Design a protein with these regions (language model features):
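Class I Rossmann-like S-adenosyl-L-methionine
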Residues: 1-143
Length: 143
């Protein structure tokens, strides 16, 4: 989320840029600051949307693995913990985030290579292994 430290940083960046450009217009600096904060907020929402996009992509990957001709037992009955993550489900059901993402120009789904790379990193991480094999199934564990 946008916090005070980020706002202070943006204010100093905009003030520095306007000082070195020789512009002394307060209204122009204010408009630049508003634009900068809006872009930061858009980036924050875009990164939030990565979570449901990643779980949806993982669901598709698991389905492809399941339909493989010579699928192993692990591929036929995969661990669905990440696909059924409560945080991802709640984010995908948030109407404000869904509406914003529908109007935003970029899509995580368009960059399949990045999603595949992130999934590979996640699947091989020790943190994911602990999460996937944990006995407790709670909201706190999903976060």
């Amino acid at each position: 989320m946008i916090n005070r430290v980020l706002i202070r940083t943006r204010v100093l960046q905009v003030a520095y840029a306007h000082l070195h450009r020789g512009e002394l217009s307060l209204s122009a600096a204010e408009q630049d600051l508003e634009l900068s904060l809006q872009r930061t907020y858009d980036l924050y929402l875009y990164l939030l949307q990565l979570i449901p996009s990643l779980t949806d992509f993982y669901r598709e990957v698991l389905e492809v693995r399941r339909r493989k001709h010579l699928a192993t037992q692990a591929e036929r009955t995969p661990n669905m913990r990440l696909v059924e993550n409560r945080l991802a489900a709640q984010l995908s059901e948030t109407p404000e985030l869904t509406a914003w993402y529908a109007g935003f120009g970029l899509r995580w789904e368009d960059d399949e290579a990045l999603l595949r790379h992130l999934l590979r990193k996640i699947e091989h991480s020790e943190l994911y292994q602990d999460y996937a094999h944990a006995r407790s199934d709670s909201w706190a564990a999903d976060q």
